[in-house]
């Protein structure tokens, strides 16, 4: 009897999941159709270069809702991520359709809002995660988190493991959209607009303001942090690298800034040698740096979640473990993105 009940419950849960997925897909496609019909009007608000990117997100999300989880995700973790970023993308589209934007200060948990660009006056999306323990009476750490190429702020911030670390450390996470084709080039000011908006919306600890980036974002932190070095307590580079052309600027502007450099030993997109050479350069320049390598890690952020949790905790605590024994084969910093 217990087995029959269990099977019945399992069937009911499966039916509910299928129905919820179908409903979610219908909602995404319905909003996408409304968005497409008003794309010209929306372009005057967001700028023409990214207007259709947001439309494409809705279509992609609808496909993800019906897709099986990738082999490196559990079903629950995948569903949490997909639900998270699809809800953020829906919120983005609905706000643009209504031309009414959620105040950043009102967000609790996972949310999406817009910040007006100081560069061109357009409205630019920013994903936000505010941990449940946040109180305006207690200053919180802030991480401004930069996503990778061909990704989005919503997909970067939605996974459960990001929320888990943010909850554990009490960190507010703010992820601006990198609308430049590569390396946040041309949209650097959007990062600082998001940073300024977060400092106005929340009570932020001035001694715990961090800049982090993954993949393309991991390269970009070395361009963006030197622009206003006093804004950042520490910088985290995940599956990215410092390039030789930026080394003098980093050495001059960020000599006292703590760096946390992360890599997967099996990364075949940004070879682990790149972050290794970055850590060697920073160490030899006398800049505080800690290096983390995940032996089974690839370029996927999910595969680096263990060392991300450790590095995040070290960053919050101000811990620096100067790396020893790193081998770069006598090579200097890379000059270009692989």
Where are these regions (language model features)?
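Short substrate-entry loop that stabilizes the transition state in hydrolases
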Residues: 134-185, 244
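A domain-start/cap signature at the N-terminus of enzymes
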Residues: 22-140, 320-338
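Cell-envelope and extracellular/periplasmic
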Residues: 147-151, 199-202, 214, 221, ...
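Alpha-helical scaffolding within the catalytic cores
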Residues: 155-163, 194, 240-251, 273, ...
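Gly/Ser-rich "nucleophile elbow"/oxyanion-hole loop immediately N-terminal to the catalytic nucleophile
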Residues: 132-139, 184-216, 229
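Primarily recognizes the serine-hydrolase "nucleophile elbow" in alpha/beta-hydrolase
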Residues: 200, 207-255
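Bacterial N-terminal signal peptides
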Residues: 8-17
